[in-house]
A protein has these predicted regions:
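Exposed beta-strand-loop-beta-strand "reactive/processing" segments of non-cytosolic proteins
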Residues: 48-95, 142-191, 251-253, 377
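Short, glycine/acidic-rich hinge or "gate" loops at secondary-structure transitions
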Residues: 138-144, 417-424
Length: 632
């Protein structure tokens, strides 16, 4: 072959290396692509000196082009923030053409709080005389203090309307778990733009700093118990899944995934092999937003209602997973790469795990039994004091499950011995953990047997009134109600009726003549306890309902809006659905919020045992019979 290798020959001879392989349109950006995107933007002369890259990620191409397998130029989406001017820009860089396709300032937008912000806040408070005096009054050496920057929220407070704002919270830096040593009643409301403290809370000088160890490693945890008997997980012939050009194939499932800097794990083009073809189920599924509101009204706590995805980022806070510890020994692990604030790629080794595990009994009757196997796609994000594990679990019976595992260190406050108040619970000497909630909102772009048309049906089990149709009092029926508009589709759970929702394709019938579908089966949940007129609820309006349905729009990704940091609310789902658009026989997106109310207990300290919650998407008339019937 000639060394120049014509394109036609390159398509025939896979060994020709002069033509790079074409990335799948949904493949995450590589380190080289991140570098190229940043270079394109900087070379355009638009990026101010010293500006930081808050986000650089794949600009996902139009869904219809991806599904048609059209060759699409690779583009990067970037968020650029200039600290000096307090300005935010969105940019699109065409990686193939080497040009800037978009550069737009976004007024009043504040990107997520980052490590750079913590460093700035730390420097500002340490140089403030009031802060120094407050520490001395508590007998605390400023050199032993660790400052953590919290997102400030929004409460229409004086002086907080302009600039980039955070709350600076101090801890005594004793050991690795400094969260066990809060310096109570000292919180600085910091304007990072002006370099000044807006307001300084200085109460609780009479509250001692907790000194009891909160360390999580030996010998602080005490003598270890007798180790359990060895349990080895072996796959002598290797894993049962294959990955071809970024697509995972396992037990009739097919899907792609990426680790997004903000959303964390994203599933793409999920389908199931049936009858010699791959039937589509989901186009895209990911966590859209998180919100963690605290119930303590005190000055050092009322503002703590973090939007962990939109204000901090989940993917960028992913941690490296250790096989045999964070995931089973038989797991395959994969790196993730993101852009640092300076635009240089940062690699997180072993950020994602993929593994098979025993799934218990798949089905059984009498002496006929089949054992199940699960495939788990997993990552863990450490967001400040809390750790969140996210598992997408693929079952052989066609069910897809999301499991969120909550662990880590609770946010605790210092209290004087012998005192008690109703907004927290004592967990250790001089320590109480305020009551709080965790909410997770997922965006599920279901394409059941295709994107168009889909319909969402609500199902309620209803008791039949006593009478001729219910002579013995035990009869109940199932009512199905199509949801036709966005307003009608703002729904909540109902235990009394075992409420569930099904996305069906009215144009595709199963063997029994019914539309094929997939149902959302909720798990543990809770209602937001913040008052209707509170800023907490105004900013998290997407939690007013546990289920929303919208017509598919590629730009409608984040339930709380694109920039929730310092936002007064009103964006995202609340804004989009105000139009009350029709959703029947459309390409629809199902939004589901689940919540956990955490009333702390001593057993949650100094580290919280895993508390898991989740939901399932299960086939509902999608197959002719139990799809796991063919298990060997």
């Amino acid at each position: 072959l000639p060394v120049w290798c014509p394109l036609a020959l390159a398509l025939i001879y896979a060994g020709c290396r002069t033509v790079p392989p074409v990335a799948h349109p949904l493949a995450p950006l590589t380190a080289n692509e991140i570098r190229r995107a940043v270079r394109i933007l900087k070379d355009s002369g638009r990026v101010p000196p010293g500006a930081r890259f808050s986000l650089v990620a794949l600009d996902e191409p139009p869904k219809e082009l991806v599904l048609r397998q059209v060759v699409i130029p690779r583009r990067a989406f970037a968020v650029v923030y200039d600290d000096a001017a307090n300005k935010t820009w969105e940019a699109l860089a065409d990686l193939d053409a080497g040009r800037v396709d978009r550069w737009k300032e976004i007024p009043r937008a504040q990107p997520p709080v980052s490590a750079e912000d913590s460093g700035l806040a730390d420097g500002i408070v340490r140089n403030d005389r009031r802060w120094q005096q407050s520490l001395r009054a508590r007998g605390v050496d400023a050199g032993s203090v660790i400052v953590v920057a919290w997102s400030a929220g929004y409460f229409a407070l004086p002086g907080a309307g302009e600039g980039r704002i955070v709350r600076a919270i101090p801890y005594l830096g004793v050991g690795r778990n400094f969260y066990a040593h809060p310096i109570e009643g000292l919180v600085a409301h910091v304007n990072l733009t002006t370099g000044k403290i807006i307001d300084l809370l200085d109460t609780g000088r009479n509250v001692p700093v907790p000194r009891e160890s909160g360390e999580l490693a030996l010998p602080a945890t005490g003598p270890p118990r007798l180790a359990p008997a060895p349990l080895d997980i072996l796959q002598p012939r290797g894993p049962g899944f294959q990955i071809e050009d970024g697509e995972v194939r396992w037990q009739k499932w097919r899907f792609r995934y990426g680790l997004h800097p903000r959303e964390g794990l994203v599933l793409y083009t999920v389908g199931y092999e049936d009858g010699g073809r791959v039937r589509p189920i989901l186009y895209r599924a990911a966590l859209s937003e998180m919100m963690v509101p605290y119930g303590d009204p005190g000055g050092g706590w009322f503002f703590r209602n973090s939007f962990d995805a939109g204000e901090l980022g989940l993917g960028v806070n992913a941690v490296s997973l250790k096989p045999g510890v964070d995931c089973p020994a038989n797991c395959a692990v994969f790196d993730a790469v993101f852009a640092g604030g300076n635009g240089e790629p940062v690699t997180i080794p072993h950020a994602v795990a993929l593994y098979e595990r025993d799934g218990g009994i798949a089905w059984k009757h009498d002496d006929e039994t089949r054992r199940a196997r699960d495939l788990v796609l997993s990552f863990v994000a450490t967001v400040g004091n809390y750790d969140y594990g996210f598992d997408w679990i693929f079952h052989q019976d066609g069910a897809l499950e999301m499991r969120v595992a909550l662990t880590g260190v609770m946010a605790a406050k210092a209290v004087a011995e012998g005192t008690h108040e109703g907004f927290s619970h004592r967990v250790a000497k001089n320590l109480a953990a305020p009551h709080h909630q965790h909410f997770f909102t997922f965006r599920l772009d279901l394409d059941v047997d295709g994107a168009m048309p889909n319909r969402v049906v609500e199902m309620n089990s209803v008791a039949v009134p006593p009478g001729a149709q219910n002579p013995y009092g035990g009869a109940f029926t199932m009512e199905e109600t199509p949801l036709l508009t966005e307003r009608q589709a703002q729904r909540n759970l109902d235990l009394a009726s075992s409420r569930k929702w099904i996305v069906i394709n009215p144009n595709v019938m199963n063997a029994l003549g019914h539309p094929t579908g997939y149902a959302l089966l909720p798990g543990e949940n809770a209602l937001l306890l913040a008052q209707p007129d509170s800023w907490v609820r105004k900013r998290a309006g997407f939690l007013n309902s546990q289920v929303w349905v919208t017509p598919y729009r590629s730009a409608e990704i984040y339930a709380g809006g694109d920039y929730p940091n310092q936002s007064p609310g009103g964006d995202g789902l609340v804004k989009w659905t105000a139009e009350n658009r029709p959703i029947d026989n459309h390409d629809v997106v199902l939004w589901y919020s689940m919540g956990i109310t955490h009333n702390p207990r001593p057993e949650d300290w100094p580290v919280m045992p895993v508390h898991a919650a989740g939901f399932k998407l299960v086939p509902w008339g999608f197959f002719a019979r139990n799809p796991a019937l063919d298990l060997p």
